[in-house]
């Protein structure tokens, strides 16, 4: 019997990431090649026309798995019955804008979207926040959705994870598929910590394979953490195709499971693991089993790692306090 279409809502659908994402979703790369999808594009009123143009192109691709495209400027309609929500649209930081202003502007987007998801989404809804500051935007959305299990709200650190894989593979002259068990900890920001202490390269310790703490400290970690800024500098625009690719990877693994013997990185509400305060949306090593993320337990955290994880967690705590002071969460 044919599967019923899965409702996938993409916010900021007319933007660059949305454009890089929608065609891949419609082709079956998000959920699998046997799962039809119905796309819902959510945009602000002034971008509806652009979204209509994208919908026309989606039609023109004649994707067999695409059951339809709907366009909305009302979150309540866009999230009604949604199974997968990709929250891409966010208020970007502009010149001279204070971080507090950025958090407040995004609170005005992600609070109402969280409430709309709470009221209308399907029982199995999964939410991925891509729009920055992603961790705290996910925290705000989740705080407005008290009826949905907290771990259904995630923020994307898969792009950082993929960037770290690529840098490590280049250093060791191996394929990215030869590397397992790499981790991004903390915030999707310059304080994030890409951790190779548990990673393996063809079954061997990655740290032993690299054998160069100076490279790890002074090249690898800052290159991964500041890669987004380097791309803006080179391209004149932020990462779009690579961000869309990471979103596809994140949801695909969430729905279909992570490969045996490996894990990935996801920011999700902490359960207190590894000393990260409960409820804080922080990146962890995770596996996906039966459609749910589980934090990998029992990893030894050395002093080098502890210091860096704690620094990123402190930043997340500061962001949480800032949005609490603004009345965006309780």
UniProtKB/Swiss-Prot annotation:
> Keywords of this protein's UniProt record, alphabetized?
NAD, Oxidoreductase, Tricarboxylic acid cycle
Origin, by domain of life? Bacteria
> Which residues are responsible for catalysis?
188 (proton acceptor)
Q: What is its EC number?
A: 1.1.1.37
One GO term under biological process is: tricarboxylic acid cycle
The record lists the catalysed reaction(s) as: (S)-malate + NAD(+) = oxaloacetate + NADH + H(+)
Q: Which residues are recorded as binding NAD(+)?
A: 12-18, 106, 113, 130-132
CDD domains listed in its UniProt record: MDH_chloroplast-like
Any one GO molecular-function label of the UniProt entry: L-malate dehydrogenase (NAD+) activity
* SUPFAM superfamilies documented for this protein: LDH C-terminal domain-like (SSF56327), NAD(P)-binding Rossmann-fold domains (SSF51735)
Membrane-spanning parts: none
Q: Which residues bind substrate?
A: 93, 99, 132, 163
What are the disulfide bonds? none
One Pfam family from the UniProt entry? Answer: Ldh_1_C
What does this protein do, in the record's words? Answer: Catalyzes the reversible oxidation of malate to oxaloacetate.
By sequence similarity, the record places it as follows: Belongs to the LDH/MDH superfamily. MDH type 2 family.
Name the record gives this protein: Malate dehydrogenase
| Species this protein is from | Thermobifida fusca (strain YX)
